[in-house]
Amino acid sequence: MKKYTLLSLLAITLVLFSCSKKDIAQPLEETQNEDLSGYLEIASINLGGLGAAEITAFDPSTNRLFAVNNGAENKIDVIDISNPSSISVIKSISMLPYGGYVNSVAVSNGKLAAAIESTNKQAPGKVVVFNTSNYEVLKTITVGALPDMVTFSPDGNYILTANEGE
């Protein structure tokens, strides 16, 4: 009994002395919501129905926007936005040769990375890397099951995927 009393006393002492006033959370910095009334729509484009234009990536070197379009077809739409008041789809890159649906795109240093799931969602997926100017395939990389997101490292030397692996 004395053993448990001593252990309890030590535990209580430890808890009391491990807390300090500086551990108390400070109030968060107040944030201001942006006034959205200053934003105006300058253009819009219809890429299809459900599943169209879910994920996009912009390439500043070509002024092109790459949009995942899993609506009626499995493709990436290439949108010229060099003139923002008159945007248009200039190309569609079919994802059919690469497996299942494209889930994500990212752009860095003239390269477009597309995360593509396998037709069997538990099998390894792919990241296909395209040139953003001529859409040629630069590399195909096998990744984990169901790659749901793709991004480049800040220096553009590495590609990272988040795989759902259902």
Task: Label the predicted regions.
Residues 1-7:
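Bacterial N-terminal signal peptides that target proteins for export
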Residues 30-166:
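Mobile, glycine-rich extracellular loop/lid and propeptide segments
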